Structures are given as structure tokens and as C-alpha cells.
């Protein structure tokens, strides 16, 4: 089996969450990384016996690297992806793809000019339960898809943040960090082009001056519509509705209420650094693996409501309720590697390519504009 050599641009929190997948999947090898923090570079060298560079330019110049995983701060995604393409590498880019449609188009053009793949992820539209829901919709067994309801209440805004993560202009807040998940999911389920959006946003804490909440109504060609609601204000936790299974498929303690806000009483940058790769607070290995989720999701067809959960898809039909079970994942987020490997090794076009991700960002930008201008936006 051919192994893909991966170089990581940015050893922050995104890499901490993706590292277990990259380390466990035999189809990929973590060969090199770039990060300005010496302690993170040293940790990478110890953990993976790889090469570590201080700059992304140096990483892209490494001829052994085939794919650059761009996990740098959002404002640098376009620059670093284009650096990878200029060096003849493929790029796997964390969401959000970029901070403007002009940047998205530049990334797509650079990938095409280089003859390399641009894949954007992880997003929760990769999740096996979401994809299985799409298969059930596409089967036609339950009639046409009419409505999608997506809701998620978390502590997102009160997790430790760098200053730019609380600045919308630099890619901070829920519209750049969380809405791409929601929009990707409903676009995948709808299987049609989004045509209109009307949104409202909330920024209710002056100490964290970015959008912490949003609600949007999204219309698709063919008449399907979706409602998206998200709050990151660390009050209600919608994992209560998913059996206390968290976003990463981990079992959660319902008695740990308020822990995120309480932790912020300390030094925020110290807390941020210990959560980054090389810090003392790394994602815990779950005692049992379950599929990831992004809150409550219900796809309403003419003859059934379909609800993906951590272990399968519940089908609420005209006369019966049953579950379509899914086997537990062997490796979390393996679906990302499936798509990357199929593209790079087998030459199969990826679903989450540049145009797909740009269409998702077009909706996210329109949500911001709709809330600002207080009107519906045509896409």
C-alpha cells in the first residue's frame, strides 16, 4: 500500500484534534511540520521522528512532502495553500477555506495551475452518520427531502482564544469557525444549490466581541429549506439531546456544567497554549469510539424524519421507528483520509474540493452580510 507523506503547517489546536487520525492511519505518514514555536517543533520531532521547520516556506521546500495540511490561523489559509501549490504539493486545508471569495478563487486557480488537489476539511459533512443520511435521502425510499433542522448549543466562545479568534475580520467567531460545519452538512443533505439566505447573528459579550451565535434560513433549488441555529455562549449544552455524546464522539459528564467559563478565570493565553499541540492538555483518548456529531440534525422527507446520531441513523417513518446502525469507527475522522487518499493515489475527484468549499463560504459570507444589512441575500 502506498503511503502519503504529509507536512503540517501549524501545530495548534486544529492539529491536536487531527493528529490522532494522522498518526493511526497507515495510509499517511507525518513527515514534517512548520510552526514558529520551538517547543511545538521539538514535540513533533519527538512524537513522529519527523523534520520540523520554523516557517511554512521551509516546509513547502521539503521535496519529500506530498501533501501540506494547512492548519495555520484562518487569515493565512490562502497564502499557505498557494505556497504549497507553488511547490508542487497537494493541500488539505482546515475550515474555513479562506476569509473572502477572492481568496477562495485564488486558491482554486493556484491548485488548477499546479495540477494538484485542494481538499478542505475536516468538517462534519465528512461524518459517516451524515453521509449515511444522504444515502437514505438519495434512495428515494422516504420521498423527497423537504426540510432540514440543524441546532447546536456549545461553550465555543469561552474556550481559550487568541486575540484574532475573537476578531471577525481576522476569521474569528462562530460564522467562520462553526457555520462552515452547519452549511457543509445541509448542502450535502440537500444535494442542491443554495439560492437564498436570511440570517441573524448575536454578539452579546463585550469582553468577547465577535459573533457567538447565529440563526439562518437557507433555501435551495428545488424547494428544500434548512434552518441553522448555533450558540456558543456556554449555557445550554445541546449534547443533552444526543445522549451526552460530544462533538468528537466522546462521552461527556453532564455534571461538568460551567467548567469552561470557570477555567477562563485564569490566564487565557496560558490556557490556550496548554491546549495546543505540545501543551499539557491534549485531547483525551475516548474509552470507546463513536462517530462525531454537530448537535441536533433532522432531515425531514415526505415519509420520514432522519436523524443521524453517534451510532447510526434513526428513521422515524410513517408507521415505524427504527435505527439504521453504523459500525463504530476504527479511527476518528478517517473519512478525511479516505477522500485525500482517493484523490492523491487513485486520482478520484474529491467531494470537498475547492469549488465545494468556496460555495460553503459564499453562504457563510452571505449570512454575515444578511445579518449586517437585515435583509435576505440572493446567492
What do the predicted segments below correspond to?
Residues 32, 67, 147:
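Short, Asp-centered acidic motifs that coordinate Mg2+ and/or phosphate
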Residues 232-298:
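Contiguous C-terminal substrate-recognition/catalytic subdomains in enzyme active sites
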Residues 50-56:
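Conserved SAM-binding strand-loop segment of SAM-dependent methyltransferases
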Amino acid at each position: 500500500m502506498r503511503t502519503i507523506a504529509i507536512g503540517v503547517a501549524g501545530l495548534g489546536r486544529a492539529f491536536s484534534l487531527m493528529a490522532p487520525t494522522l498518526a493511526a492511519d497507515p495510509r499517511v505518514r507525518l513527515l514534517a511540520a512548520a510552526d514558529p514555536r520551538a517547543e511545538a517543533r521539538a514535540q513533533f520531532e519527538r512524537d513522529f521522528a519527523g523534520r520540523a521547520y520554523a516557517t511554512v516556506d521551509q516546509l513547502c521546500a521539503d521535496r519529500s512532502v506530498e501533501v501540506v495540511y494547512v492548519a495555520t490561523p484562518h487569515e493565512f489559509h490562502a497564502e499557505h495553500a498557494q505556497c504549497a501549490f507553488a511547490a508542487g504539493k497537494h493541500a488539505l486545508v482546515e475550515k474555513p477555506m479562506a476569509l473572502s471569495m477572492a481568496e477562495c478563487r485564488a486558491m482554486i486557480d493556484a491548485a488548477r495551475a499546479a495540477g494538484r488537489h485542494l481538499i478542505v476539511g475536516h468538517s462534519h459533512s465528512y461524518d459517516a452518520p451524515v453521509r449515511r443520511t444522504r444515502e437514505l435521502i438519495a434512495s428515494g425510499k422516504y420521498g423527497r427531502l423537504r426540510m432540514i433542522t440543524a441546532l447546536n448549543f456549545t461553550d465555543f466562545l469561552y474556550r481559550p482564544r487568541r486575540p484574532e479568534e475573537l476578531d471577525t475580520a481576522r476569521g474569528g467567531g462562530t460564522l467562520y469557525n462553526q457555520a462552515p460545519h452547519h452549511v457543509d452538512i445541509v448542502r450535502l443533505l440537500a444535494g442542491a444549490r443554495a439560492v437564498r439566505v436570511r440570517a441573524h447573528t448575536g454578539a452579546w459579550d463585550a469582553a468577547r466581541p465577535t459573533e457567538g451565535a447565529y440563526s439562518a434560513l437557507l433555501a435551495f433549488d428545488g424547494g428544500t429549506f434548512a434552518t441553522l441555529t448555533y450558540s456558543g455562549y456556554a449555557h445550554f449544552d445541546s449534547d443533552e439531546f444526543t445522549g451526552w455524546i460530544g462533538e468528537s464522539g466522546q462521552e461527556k459528564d453532564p455534571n461538568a456544567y460551567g467548567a469552561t467559563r470557570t477555567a477562563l478565570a485564569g490566564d487565557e493565553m496560558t490556557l490556550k497554549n496548554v491546549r495546543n499541540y505540545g501543551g499539557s492538555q491534549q485531547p483525551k483518548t475516548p474509552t470507546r469510539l463513536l462517530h462525531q456529531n454537530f448537535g441536533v440534525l433532522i432531515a425531514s422527507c415526505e415519509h420520514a424524519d432522519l436523524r443521524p446520531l453517534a451510532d447510526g441513523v434513526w428513521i422515524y417513518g410513517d408507521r415505524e421507528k427504527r435505527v439504521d446502525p453504523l459500525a463504530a469507527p476504527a479511527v476518528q475522522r478517517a473519512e478525511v483520509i479516505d477522500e485525500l487518499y482517493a484523490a492523491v493515489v487513485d486520482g478520484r475527484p474529491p467531494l470537498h474540493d475547492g469549488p465545494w468549499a468556496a460555495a460553503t463560504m459564499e453562504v457563510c459570507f452571505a449570512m454575515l452580510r444578511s445579518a449586517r444589512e437585515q435583509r435576505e441575500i440572493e446567492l
